[in-house]
Amino acid sequence: SLSGDVFTNCMAIFLISYILNLIYTCRHLKVVDYIIIGMVSCCVAVSKIVYLPLCALIFIIPKECFYSKKFSNILKKRIVVLIIFLCSVVIGVIWLKISSGFLTSASPSSELQVKYILNHPILYFVTVLRTVSIEFNNWSLDMVGGFMQWGQMFTLYPIISISVYFIFFMSLLVEENDVKLSKSSKLLIFLIFFITFILILTALYVQWTAKAGEIGGNLITGIQGRYFTPIFLLIPIILPSLVTSTDKKINRNVILYSIILLQIPTLLSIVVNNIN
């Protein structure tokens, strides 16, 4: 698919993966690294403003990556990182202002919904909890499957369930976590996850729920599981690995290829559906 959500998810996942790779290899940042991180961060911020907090992941890059014999050079590199983040924020906000007038879901009732949230934060928090408790299972399944072909097809539940299980198993039980992060970095990642999660829910509450005429509605509508795919990847980073270096490890590729093979029936169904 070449839809906007796919592009946005790819950019967000690439940003997370690239930064984690820098941490894992612990290599010194080069000019090309700053360029790549800056460009991808701006793409993420422009694609969906709710993913803007992901750009703050740049701050978990350890000081070893900024090593230099001169303290002034280290300071300059830190300043460049801060500038990249600020540019992403500014560009994202500017584009939001420009594009907001072209949103098909824009509605005068959106302002009323924003006022409701500001005037009744506790009630809105209850609405968030209620929505999560009701829709959590659907979101979990929708992250790795769900409706396709404009609602004409749906991934088989066994395939979705097994895929979700394999992903968690591969993340937490297969091998020791290679990326070591400090407590402050994990706290920052958690805050990024939480803020992004709330922004996703709030954006849909202001746009889709308000558009349906439900000012102060009890449930948030219009949320799809794929919106959480990028931040879903942050969870295994925060959680401790459930294996130690002495445990017998399972080849991660075995599970990875199993997940890919599970998608073959879905791909065949799409082909057959398009042929007919």
Regions found by a protein language model. Give the residues of each.
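Transmembrane helical bundles and short interhelical boundary loops of multi-pass, membrane-embedded
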Residues: 94-98, 248-276
